[in-house]
From Swiss-Prot:
Organism placement in taxonomy: Bacteria, Bacillati, Bacillota, Bacilli, Bacillales
Protein origin, superkingdom: Bacteria
Family statement: Belongs to the universal ribosomal protein uS8 family.
InterPro entries: Ribosomal_uS8, Ribosomal_uS8_CS, Ribosomal_uS8_sf
Subunit structure: Part of the 30S ribosomal subunit. Contacts proteins S5 and S12.
Name listed for the protein in its UniProt record: Small ribosomal subunit protein uS8
Pfam (any one): Ribosomal_S8
Length: 132
């Protein structure tokens, strides 16, 4: 069976692993998932990202991050633009997540970037997801 929304699958896997406090998780690789994983790492939501090449499409290995007393760093993930209802925003309409405490992942002509970076570069695009 084919997967209709691989990004939602990625976010669901991260959410589920985070809820049961797994140290790492693996998911099928794609270019957009790699970009999303790198943003999550650079923004401090996950510890590390590894790419494992195999004969097929490869695997992304995410190492989740937890604070003191094993508290979750990622408190929420929400898919915004879905295959059945795409959500786009112009450069001046890119939303802030929780007044700047979270990030919005924006797919632009310059690749996948955060909402802050999109405002700084003055570009709009498809709002992929919110992370907080």
């Amino acid at each position: 069976m084919t997967m209709t929304d691989p990004i939602a699958d990625m976010l669901t896997r991260v959410r589920n692993a985070n809820m049961v406090r797994h140290e790492k998780l693996e998911l099928p690789a794609s270019n957009i998932k790699k970009e999303i994983a790198e943003i999550l790492k650079s923004e401090g939501f996950i510890k590390n990202v590894e790419y494992v090449e195999d004969d097929k499409q490869g695997v992304i290995r995410l190492f989740l991050k937890y604070g003191q007393n094993n508290e979750r760093v990622i408190t929420g993930l929400k898919r915004i633009s879905k295959p059945g209802l795409r959500v786009y925003a112009k450069a001046n309409e890119v939303p802030k997540v929780l007044n700047g405490l979270g990030i919005a992942l924006v797919s632009t002509s310059e690749g996948v970037i955060t909402d802050k970076e999109a405002r700084k570069r003055n570009v709009g695009g498809e709002i992929i997801a919110y992370v907080w």
